Amino acid sequence: MSYTNSPLVSYTCLSPYHSGERNHTIDTVTIHCVVGQCSVESLGTRFSDGSTKASSNYGIGYDGKIGMYVEEKNRSWCSSSSSNDNRAITIEVASDTVAPYKVSEKAMESLVNLLTDICRRNGIKNLLWKADKSLIGQVHEQNMTVHRWFAPTACPGEYLYSKHSDIAAEVNKRLSQEITEDSNVIYRVQCGAFKNRRFAENMVKQLKAQGYSDAFVVSVIK
């Protein structure tokens, strides 16, 4: 299977701490809290300098920037579960250092944007959340998991945990709004309107020089 990475990434710092190519298709997402209102750059340093020997596929800073630390084709070291991390895209989100580990509005918006992109590219039609640990791996029932199901940790914190249903609903709303093209409709593109015909003809020449051979001038009476 071929894998792609998110075009929403604005910072990349690939961590050496991963297991190489995953052994399962991507069908799950796991949201984590960093426990710190950090930047994507500082999180990248943490995942690269050996201080934690951990990683995630993506991270979101306090300011909403998105970083990539492990390419989607590879399994990150994030959830204390090999089976989970082989099938999940893992995302660390900057958060407060104390419970309930709240995240910023900018970080939350970027999280929803990133999840929508991940689902679209990997063929995940809907995010499903039932807060039920017994459904791990049953992705037709639930395809969101949390770190606390695999290790004695509070991650992702009560703030993000309580938002999982809302996050899934917003992502699913966006996924359902993809444009459906009507084969009986054509779309005309206008590049400009000029009072001077010479300017209009110059624009047509520029467009044709770029390969748009069907460009033409239309006169409109005001």
Q: Where are the model-predicted features located?
A:
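N-terminal catalytic cores of peptidoglycan-degrading enzymes
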Residues: 1-85, 155, 193
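Glycine-rich, often proline-containing surface loops adjacent to acidic residues and nearby aromatics
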Residues: 86-97
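Short strand-loop junctions, especially beta-strand C-caps/beta-turns
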Residues: 34, 94-96, 190-194
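Solvent-exposed beta-strand motifs enriched in subsets of small alpha/beta binding domains
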Residues: 179-222
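Basic/polar, cationic surfaces and motifs that engage anionic cell-wall
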Residues: 2-12, 18-23, 97-183, 220-222
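Solvent-exposed, acidic/flexible segments
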Residues: 24, 51, 84, 100-108, ...
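Structural preference for beta-strand elements that scaffold enzyme active sites
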Residues: 28, 88-90, 143-145
